[in-house]
Amino acid sequence: MGKNILDTLWLNGSVFENCTMGSIQNTFKIYGMDAAYTIWKEANHTIENCNGNVEKLNQGFLSLKRAFNVASIELRKNLGLDKIRYSGKKKERDFLADLEYFEITKTLTLNKYLKIRNLIEHENETPPPLEDCLSLSEYIWNYIRTIANVLSFFSESILFSKADYPEHEIYFDYVMKAKGKDFFPHLYVTGLVKGKEISFTCKDSFLEINEIKLLNKYDMEKSRYLKSRAHSLDELHSIAFFGEILDQDILAKYVKLSILPEYGGVNERSIQTIFSKI
């Protein structure tokens, strides 16, 4: 069966100019982070009070790795960073490299990063030295705090609208879907814009949206977002659509901008940089 010629549209990046951002929602659960912190706290106490007892040191070390894994599971479940195939991704399963790419973990030097990585992947029967265990404990404590902050502030739904043109709304939804034991992120777009802002052929500086469905008035009346705007289609210059952004580099930039405070977050200005190919 041939490919539907209308399965992709391109949205003019200028639609975000003079927009205001709102309707931000955050329903991510971070209960697993409480468990990770409890495990870390007990592990750190065990290590600090092992008094040279190798068995206790090993117990604390293994608990540290468990705390890391529990926190990592929450990050995977809520953001799916390990499933984003950004350019330069070298291995399918290299979670530590993904953490480095998305700047979830920051280290001062390459040597320190490699040392921490070796400790996390340590599989010898005997634990690392006490000093290394304490260093790993500090690292994992910061890791847990970072993830808790990321999950607290990440916005899963964002609206861009224009006060001077009510029939202009663009929603982004970051949705996680489970497949077996894996969690995959999806970035969906629901929009109501002027027809002149859309192209069905590729154009530079336009955002590519895939697997689209053009919405009719009946679809809009059932829509989570556009129900109150269904009458807008009575005016032939408006187009409503639903689709997904499949470009993994755009997905990666969207997440980075959303989770890293130093990047300023997603707003009416930064949103355009996400879709820039430059």
Regions found by a protein language model. Give the residues of each.
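Charged alpha-helical initiation segments
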Residues: 1-58, 152-156, 257-278
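Short, charged amphipathic alpha-helical segments flanked by flexible coils
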Residues: 76-106
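Short, charged/polar, low-complexity loop and linker segments
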Residues: 42-50, 90-98, 118-122
